């Protein structure tokens, strides 16, 4: 298989010389700041849409409907296509932008893509903070989406290529950790800006998105590019020097040879999109489609960017709903550290399976709690004790996602693709992630209105399906060098029919023409 490496017939993977260096740690820390812009937007959008001053200015019909329905159906009071378009337009823009980002990443490197994403996101943040009408608001959201699309396409690849194999999981998950930090920061900012007299706090919330954008863009100016990217652009001497620097040793011959072989195979590919559709890459194609799709079908982004609206819907006051969102943001961030500490020791499959089971139970219990209190009529006065139980249940769900499908939904796809299809395949990951984020964001409030408490059962059923998918179809990838990843498919009971059983034994490096 193109981009493969020599592996022993017993399937033991190579252990390249090298160590974790301060240089790699700092580079990955700076690159992972790309997650801040994504996380900040997830957290900020739901908060401002629960602020009365924001609704009065841009969505007066939603505000009027909210006030009219205090004693009626709580499920439907925020159902507005225009309001959901404000939230979801970003993800549609990110979807389209990621396709263009693939070309930029391949031709100019991961660093340039991250820099461009940060600058475009910065412009969008300024427009949103200064918005005078809905059109200006949506245009700003679209620019934010382009920035997110560029960032999400390049950052996971950068982290996976810079990290040594035995620590790839931990370093790659720093991207998801930064997403959770962004969400928490946004929730805290919303809580305090909602208290600003004069009704302009939402401008501060939206405008402060410029801060993570500046961090990402500024940091990208000082980042080195990865050896993989340098080789694919014909910079052999720079690539070898960079590999020595990031591994902290001069003994990089075996790893460098494998990278060169992968690069030669990559250069032989004229159209990586067409190559991705070839039968031998069927496992990677399926994973690049289903993992991001299933990640969004957990319902996590519904909880995170609609958390204040959701809490308000089930009876919390405005300030209480924002504080509840802060609590879930804290849980989200701290639970991510569990994944960082265990992913390279326990492996990807165990975390995904255990997290899936926990999410299933949490969703069904949450649906039952809301069903008992609100029924199908959506009318109830929720007590403080009952509200606490609901928040605890949501926290159980969020924590499960944060140490499983949250970080691993980005990690696993970024580490399984050979170099010749890596940029294109990562764009597919981002496209499907953003597509289903857009779809769910656009229809969530309508689904809540029509399915009522059944919406949580729907997401629970999706989590049952995805847990089964991991159990049967996802092989373990921990500790395997990124350019040797092809061998796991040849040893898998199902995928070996596409790549050939020989891929699990000794694999000769070949190029595709």
Swiss-Prot record:
Cytoplasmic-side stretches of the chain, per the record, are 1-17, 103-116, 161-166, 223-294, 342-347, 407-425, 472-512
Q: What induces it?
A: Repressed by cold. Repressed by abscisic acid (ABA).
Q: Which residues lie on this side of the membrane: Extracellular?
A: 39-81, 138-139, 188-201, 316-320, 369-385, 447-450
Give the UniProt tissue specificity note.
Expressed specifically in anthers.
Keywords assigned by UniProt? Membrane, Sugar transport, Symport, Transmembrane, Transmembrane helix, Transport
Membrane-spanning parts: 18-38, 82-102, 117-137, 140-160, 167-187, 202-222, 295-315, 321-341, 348-368, 386-406, 426-446, 451-471
Query: What does this protein do, in the record's words?
Result: Mediates active uptake of hexoses by sugar:proton symport. May play an important role in transporting monosaccharides during anther development.
Q: According to its UniProt record, which protein family does this protein belong to?
A: Belongs to the major facilitator superfamily. Sugar transporter (TC 2.A.1.1) family.
Q: What is this protein called?
A: Sugar transport protein MST8
Query: What organism is the protein native to?
Result: Oryza sativa subsp. japonica
């Amino acid at each position: 298989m193109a981009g493969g490496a020599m592996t022993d017939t017993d399937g033991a993977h190579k252990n390249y010389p090298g160590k974790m260096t301060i240089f790699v740690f700092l580079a990955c820390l700076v690159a992972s700041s790309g997650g801040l812009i994504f996380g900040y937007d997830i957290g900020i959008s739901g908060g401002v849409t629960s602020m009365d001053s924001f609704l009065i200015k841009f969505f007066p019909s939603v505000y009027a409907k909210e006030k009219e329905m205090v004693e009626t159906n709580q499920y439907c009071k925020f159902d507005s296509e225009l309001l959901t378009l404000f939230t979801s337009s970003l993800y549609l823009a990110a979807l389209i932008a990621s396709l263009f980002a693939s070309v930029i990443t391949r031709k100019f490197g991961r660093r340039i893509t991250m820099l461009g994403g940060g600058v475009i996101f910065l412009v969008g943040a300024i427009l949103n903070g200064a918005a005078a009408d809905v059109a200006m608001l949506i245009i700003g959201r679209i620019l934010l989406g382009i920035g997110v699309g560029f960032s999400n396409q390049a950052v996971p690849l950068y982290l996976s290529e810079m990290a040594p194999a035995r620590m790839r999981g931990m370093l790659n998950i720093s991207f998801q950790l930064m997403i959770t930090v962004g969400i928490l920061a946004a929730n805290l900012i919303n809580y305090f800006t909602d208290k600003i007299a004069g009704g302009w706090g939402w401008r501060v919330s939206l405008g402060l998105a410029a801060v993570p954008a500046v961090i990402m863009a500024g940091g990208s100016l000082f980042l080195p590019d990865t050896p993989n990217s340098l080789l694919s652009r014909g910079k052999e001497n720079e690539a070898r020097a960079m590999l020595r620097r990031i591994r902290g040793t001069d003994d990089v011959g075996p790893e460098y040879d494998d990278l060169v072989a992968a690069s030669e195979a990559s250069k032989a590919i004229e159209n990586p999109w067409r190559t991705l559709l070839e039968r031998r890459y069927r496992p990677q194609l399926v994973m690049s489609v289903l993992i991001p799709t299933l990640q969004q079908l957990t319902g996590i982004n519904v909880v995170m960017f609609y958390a204040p609206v959701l809490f308000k819907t089930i009876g919390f006051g405005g300030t209480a709903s924002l504080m509840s969102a802060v609590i879930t943001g804290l849980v989200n961030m701290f639970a991510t550290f569990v994944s960082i500490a265990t992913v390279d020791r326990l492996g990807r499959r165990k975390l995904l399976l255990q997290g899936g089971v926990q999410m299933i139970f949490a969703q069904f219990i949450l649906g039952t709690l809301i069903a008992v209190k609100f029924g199908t009529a959506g009318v109830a006065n929720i007590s403080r004790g009952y509200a606490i139980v609901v928040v605890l249940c949501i926290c159980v769900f969020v924590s499960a996602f944060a140490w499983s499908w949250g970080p691993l939904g980005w990690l696993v796809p970024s580490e399984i693709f050979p170099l010749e299809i890596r940029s294109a395949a990562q764009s597919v990951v981002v496209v499907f992630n953003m597509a289903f984020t857009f779809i769910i964001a656009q229809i969530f409030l309508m689904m809540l209105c029509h399915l009522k408490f059944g919406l949580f059962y729907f997401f629970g059923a999706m989590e049952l399906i995805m847990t089964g998918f991991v159990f049967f179809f996802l092989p373990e990838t921990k500790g395997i060098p990124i350019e040797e990843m092809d061998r796991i498919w040849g040893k898998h009971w199902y995928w070996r029919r596409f790549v050939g059983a020989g891929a699990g034994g000794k694999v000769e490096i070949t190029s595709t023409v």
